Amino acid sequence: MSTNNMDRFEFRCIRPEETPQAIEIEQICFPPNEACSPKSLTERIKATAETFLVAEDKETGKLAAFLNGVPTDEDAFRDEFFTDISLINPEGKNIMLLGLDVRPEYRMQGLGRELVSRYGQREAQKGRKKLFLTCLDEKVKMYEKFGFTDLGQANSTWGGETWHAMSIEIGK
């Protein structure tokens, strides 16, 4: 999607009433063993809606995609970030990205890249230093194109999978 095509979307924090849409998108984007549970996603939205960035399709009024993370002072991703909202540190220097969820009909158009870019800019303005994430082998190249560095195998067994740890500097 060109920048002009991004005008089709409103980029903003998630609203509580959009929780069912976020749960639906998560279940579409990830297999059951990898998806965040509806309970955990609901808790995270209630606790830190400001750590979500959504792309709402202005034509349909529906969420096309979202990105969410956990602010922390930690420098390594761990699986507990997915389930334990007590790990949220609103003043944390880093963000552990938990999911980039793009509905299938909006993929391959640059929307994921746009969300990551806007999210990084927003969090850098808050004084954050780095974004961290984990991804499967087949997504490493995509995140490298977004500017992330592959840090090797992650200390994660989420969903019974082997994950790559990746990071990108966003602030000074």
What are these regions (language model features)?
Residues 31-59, 66-87:
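Active-site rim helix/loop that mediates acceptor-substrate recognition in acyltransferases
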Residues 95, 116, 122-136:
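Conserved GNAT acetyl-CoA-binding A-motif
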Residues 13, 24-37:
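Helix-loop element at the rim of GNAT/NAT acetyltransferase active sites that forms part
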Residues 15, 98, 103, 136:
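Residue-level recognition of the GNAT/N-acetyltransferase active site
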Residues 8-22:
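A short beta-loop-alpha structural element at the N-terminal edge
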Residues 102, 108-121:
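Conserved acetyl-CoA-binding loop-helix of GNAT-fold acetyltransferases
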Residues 62-100, 107, 157-162:
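Conserved acyl-donor/pantetheine-binding loop and adjacent beta-alpha core of acyl/acetyltransferases
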Residues 71-74, 132-134, 144, 149-165:
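Conserved catalytic-core motifs of GNAT/GCN5-like acyltransferases
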